[in-house]
């Protein structure tokens, strides 16, 4: 029986390294043999494709606009055209596929297109075991229903007081969207040795990713961060996170059999 994909949404304020965490998590699932992985870039300001070393030529947002502003080819209705273009927008790579959502537009007349994109995503998801979504702190695409409710939300944060405020705000948004507390996990990124992380109450971070010069070197060299050495501290930490997530996904599958 086909397993329902396990969806991980990764959120956090700008500058915390959530796109780095997203790309390393995708790479870790590939290393674990969980292929293909579906990578979803749902942050208009993010560059997940660059972190993964691929090129994106169009987004689903622009495709949706196109379906309403351009002439539809003869023999196609808007439903068929959107489905056709959706597959064209998908970037296929080694071990993963990537789709960029683009900037969300207003509702109203776009409700039809949003619903159709949601339908396309549901059909696409059947081909994957894990889906990693690099999303905005406000999680607009999730709140609009285009991406559905994730199985897990990872809040990437700095290990400091400002990080606590971000964690609290994103957690509130997630709760308002109906996400259960047990699905929400904290990831401290760029943790410097000898520093104490902010007190997050009864929560225990699911991962603490150390500050890694290899990540900074990749950024300075403009090379994909997902391709840093396998023994680099950040990559080792995220691989451990991937193991934990795979275990959680397996436990979920047992409950749904």
Sequence positions of predicted segments:
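N-terminal phosphate/diphosphate-binding loop that engages ATP/GTP or pyrophosphate donors
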Residues: 31-93
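Cytosolic-facing regulatory segments adjacent to core modules
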Residues: 80-93, 97-135
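C-terminal boundary of histidine-terminating zinc-finger modules
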Residues: 221-232
């Amino acid at each position: 029986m086909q397993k329902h994909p396990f969806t991980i949404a990764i959120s956090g304020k700008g500058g915390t390294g959530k796109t780095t965490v997203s790309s390393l998590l995708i790479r870790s699932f590939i290393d674990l043999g969980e292929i293909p992985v579906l990578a979803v870039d749902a942050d208009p300001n993010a560059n997940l494709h660059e972190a993964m070393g691929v090129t994106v030529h169009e987004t689903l947002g622009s495709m949706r606009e196109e379906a309403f502003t351009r002439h539809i080819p003869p023999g196609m209705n808007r439903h068929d055209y959107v489905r056709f273009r959706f597959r064209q927008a998908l970037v296929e790579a080694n071990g993963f596929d990537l789709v960029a959502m683009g900037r969300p537009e207003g509702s109203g007349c776009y409700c039809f297109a949003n619903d159709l994109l949601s339908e396309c995503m549901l059909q696409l998801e059947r081909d994957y075991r894990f889906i990693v979504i690099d999303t905005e702190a406000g999680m607009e695409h999730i709140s609009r229903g285009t991406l559905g409710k994730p199985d897990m939300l990872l809040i990437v944060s700095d290990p400091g007081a400002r990080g606590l405020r971000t964690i609290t705000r994103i957690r509130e948004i997630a709760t308002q969207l109906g996400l259960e507390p047990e699905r929400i996990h904290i990831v401290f990124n760029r943790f410097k040795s000898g520093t104490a992380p902010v007190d997050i109450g009864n929560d225990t971070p699911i991962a603490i990713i150390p500050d890694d010069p290899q990540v900074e070197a990749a950024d300075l060299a403009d090379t994909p961060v997902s391709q840093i050495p396998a023994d680099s501290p950040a990559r080792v930490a995220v691989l451990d996170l991937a193991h934990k997530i795979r275990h959680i996904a397996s436990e979920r599958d047992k409950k749904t059999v």
